[in-house]
């Protein structure tokens, strides 16, 4: 059984546009390869004048709404298709895009200007198509038409492009296009035929309504915000003509100017503001104040309303303003508004600041302290201690090169930064050592050699109580201070050695023996 197809009925603009749209969507449906700089467009589509030969080999099922059969198709006509796209001619750009796609950007070098895209236009023309294949057709009034090929129907195809002068590119394009055409007959063409059959053979009213709803929704006016307006998009001629006619309608001296919907004109602005509620208008209506009777251009109240000498009037105006604001607030919210309250005549709570830690005063002369206090007043209160006796860690010095201590002032003796080497007691033995509690045979000595006392104040000595068992290295600072004070009052005058004439530091240095005399 064979059929004769009237091929000329396919030469319609509507079918050509619809087929071009389907092919464009199918060619750009997948992920675009990096070598293509733009989408693929259908530049020319012509079905030709020669119809294909269609032969039915077997009919498996035949009914009023169903059909299943095996057919054979042969085509060697003048159908041609022209595609237009742009290809990327810079290989560095392709390499960089592939690296970014494979998450290897951290090892991809930055080529700067060398990786800028360079696109070239490309036109592909497909003609002289030879098709010979066996397929299976399954038709259903509800599910449409399904077409599947048993073999590869493409025999040959001619590919011409703008790169035919380069033989390598021409051969590469020929192989790639043949591969894509075979995929087209295997996957894309059955999908297109199925959609075409559903468009013309669907008898369900629900599908018709589903297609009609988006078209009706597109007819409704959509709100346009200021952010949706793109200044780079050109205006349509229809909108420009409407704006021009509206502008010319305002260039007149007539009193009857046509109104603009959903807008307020400047000439009618006063009528609009009179009906608009405001604080000034509410004050004028409630209190009948002459001061706000004049037309106001803003919603601000005159300052003379609240700056008058009469407190009762000012209080009355402020209460009215508060009531207007409260009533306006309660229209949109049910919660109580927060107001700032200022209490007049309240006593300030006096908080006595107690110092966290008392600061000990350093021995500064009274003249210097008074001069410093007159120049800069510090908020810090110093603790005044009557007793100025404190101990500093002295520096040991040699006995022969030391200068004599100036003992005119007893206090300078305490704060002197040098001291002679301490002397061992007269009853010392091998058990005595130089270190702190150092014993040769690990026996406690009766008189241990101690280091110089740590700096402490008399107040701390009185407050701090040592409880418990005392260690070997314990120093009784109070006893040392008392002995030191007693020593200061009994220090004799500085004497010199009769033989050498060198001054002696009494209390820390023993005089050397006299020179040997024969």
UniProtKB/Swiss-Prot annotation:
Basic and acidic residues biased stretches: 492-506
Keyword set includes Cytoplasm: no
BP GO terms, sorted: mitochondrial genome maintenance; mitochondrion-endoplasmic reticulum membrane tethering; phospholipid transport
Transmembrane domains' residue ranges: none
Biased composition (Basic residues): 336-350
Membrane topology field: Multi-pass membrane protein
Major subcellular location class: mitochondrion
PROSITE patterns named in the record: SMP
Entry annotated with the keyword Kinase: no
Domain of life where this protein originates: Eukaryota
InterPro entries to which the protein is assigned, alphabetical: Mdm34, SMP_LBD
UniProtKB keywords: Lipid transport, Lipid-binding, Membrane, Mitochondrion, Mitochondrion outer membrane, Transmembrane, Transmembrane beta strand, Transport
Compartment(s): Mitochondrion outer membrane
Residues in SMP-LTD domain copies: 1-198
Gene Ontology CC annotations of this record: ERMES complex
An annotated Gene Ontology molecular function: lipid binding
Stretches the record annotates as Disordered: 335-369, 491-518
Quaternary assembly: Component of the ER-mitochondria encounter structure (ERMES) or MDM complex, composed of MMM1, MDM10, MDM12 and MDM34.
Function: Component of the ERMES/MDM complex, which serves as a molecular tether to connect the endoplasmic reticulum (ER) and mitochondria. Components of this complex are involved in the control of mitochondrial shape and protein biogenesis, and function in nonvesicular lipid trafficking between the ER and mitochondria. MDM34 is required for the interaction of the ER-resident membrane protein MMM1 and the outer mitochondrial membrane-resident beta-barrel protein MDM10.
Family membership: Belongs to the MDM34 family.
Description of its domains: Lacks alpha-helical transmembrane segments, suggesting that it resides in the membrane via beta-sheet conformations similar to those predicted for other outer membrane proteins and porin.
Name of this chain's protein: Mitochondrial distribution and morphology protein 34
Organism, as annotated: Meyerozyma guilliermondii (strain ATCC 6260 / CBS 566 / DSM 6381 / JCM 1539 / NBRC 10279 / NRRL Y-324) (Yeast)
Gene transcribed to yield this protein: MDM34
């Amino acid at each position: 059984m064979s059929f004769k197809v009237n091929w000329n009925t396919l030469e319609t603009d509507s079918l050509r546009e619809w087929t071009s749209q389907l092919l464009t969507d199918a060619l750009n449906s997948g992920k675009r390869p990096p070598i293509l700089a733009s989408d693929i467009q259908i530049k020319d589509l012509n079905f030709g004048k020669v119809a294909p030969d269609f032969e039915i080999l077997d009919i498996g099922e035949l009914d009023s709404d169903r059909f299943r059969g095996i057919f054979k198709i042969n085509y060697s006509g003048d159908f041609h298709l022209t595609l237009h796209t742009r290809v990327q001619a810079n290989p560095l750009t392709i390499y960089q895009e592939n690296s970014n796609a494979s998450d290897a950007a951290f090892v991809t070098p930055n080529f700067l200007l060398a990786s800028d895209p360079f696109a070239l236009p490309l036109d592909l023309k497909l003609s002289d198509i030879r098709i010979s294949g066996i397929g299976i057709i399954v038709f259903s009034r509800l599910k449409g038409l399904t077409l599947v090929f048993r073999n590869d129907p493409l025999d040959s195809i001619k590919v011409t492009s703008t790169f035919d002068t380069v033989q390598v590119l021409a051969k590469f394009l020929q192989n790639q296009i043949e591969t894509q055409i075979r995929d087209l007959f295997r996957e894309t063409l059955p999908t297109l035929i199925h959609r075409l059959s559903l468009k013309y053979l669907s008898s369900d009213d629900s599908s018709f309504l589903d297609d009609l709803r988006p078209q009706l929704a597109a007819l409704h006016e959509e709100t346009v915000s200021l952010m949706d307006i793109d200044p780079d998009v050109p205006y349509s001629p229809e909108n420009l003509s409407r704006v021009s006619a509206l502008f010319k309608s305002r260039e007149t001296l007539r009193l009857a100017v046509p109104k603009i919907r959903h807008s307020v004109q400047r000439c009618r602005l006063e009528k609009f503001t009179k009906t608009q509620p405001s604080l000034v208008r509410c004050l004028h209506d409630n209190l009948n104040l002459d001061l706000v009777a004049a037309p106001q251009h803003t919603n601000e109240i005159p300052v003379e309303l609240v700056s008058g000498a009469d407190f009762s009037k000012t209080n009355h105006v402020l209460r009215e303003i508060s009531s207007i604001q409260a009533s306006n607030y309660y229209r949109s919210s049910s919660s109580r508004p927060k107001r700032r309250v200022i209490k007049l005549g309240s006593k300030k709570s006096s908080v006595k600041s107690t110092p966290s830690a008392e600061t000990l005063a350093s021995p500064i002369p009274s003249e210097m302290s008074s001069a410093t206090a007159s120049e800069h007043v510090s908020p810090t209160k110093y603790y005044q201690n009557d007793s100025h006796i404190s101990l500093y860690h002295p520096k040991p010095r040699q006995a022969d090169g030391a200068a004599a201590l100036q003992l005119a002032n007893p206090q300078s003796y305490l704060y002197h930064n040098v001291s002679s080497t301490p002397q061992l007691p007269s009853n010392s033995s091998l058990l005595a050592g130089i270190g702190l509690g150092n014993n040769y045979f690990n026996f406690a000595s009766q008189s241990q050699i101690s280091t110089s006392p740590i700096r402490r104040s008399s107040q701390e000595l009185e407050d701090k109580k040592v409880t418990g068992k005392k260690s070997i290295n314990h120093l009784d600072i109070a006893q040392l201070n008392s002995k030191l004070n007693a020593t200061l009052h009994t220090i004799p005058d500085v004497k010199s050695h009769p033989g050498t004439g060198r001054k002696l530091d009494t209390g820390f240095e023993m005089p050397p023996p006299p020179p040997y005399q024969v």
